[in-house]
């Protein structure tokens, strides 16, 4: 009886140790993935800055933000000429910085890509407005802006639409949030201007994410 108890105790101790190891591996993997994403955002920001285009990044959220005054005239959904120039620069930088973390159209990553198991799951192009105006108008404006930005990004680099995730699904998609996700309180004009923006959100998956699980 005591022998069986000892065996059972050892069995549960082994399961607990295995679960703890898997949990530690998952935390380490997620932390490393966040660092990789932060580096990608930093490289995107640097590429834009070299062309005189100032953008903001939020590494914790995986977001690069382009303000309205870079891309659009106030209240308009069509890209301004300056906006088209900025998007063209962004498109080239996106391809250069994402191709190593996706599956290219021909299935072959560039030879100079680093050895990595990190990958891009999706890239969301998000439109945002301030709180001025009606909800319907803001929803429509944010969606149209994100769609127009998406179209010009794809047109600026024909290789971008061919980038896919591990499941061979297209990585780019759009979203419009209207006033629902302000970056700052909509209390003063300066903050409202900051809220009128397009965000590029990178969603990454860690290496072997599907294999990190606790044994039942």
PLM regions with names:
Residues 1-35:
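Short terminal targeting/anchoring segments
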Residues 30-48:
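N-proximal, solvent-exposed amphipathic alpha-helical segments enriched in charged/polar residues
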Residues 36, 58-97, 130-139:
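Short, solvent-exposed beta-strand/turn patches at coil↔beta or beta↔helix junctions
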Residues 49, 53, 92-100, 151-159:
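Sec-exported extracytoplasmic/periplasmic mature domains
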Residues 52-65, 113-121:
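Short edge beta-strands and adjacent turn/loop segments
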Residues 71-81, 110-216:
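Periplasmic OmpA-like peptidoglycan-binding domain that tethers envelope proteins to the cell wall
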Residues 97, 101-102, 116-119:
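An N-terminal amphipathic alpha-helical segment
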Residues 99-111:
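Short acidic alpha-helical/loop segments enriched in Asp/Glu that coordinate divalent cations
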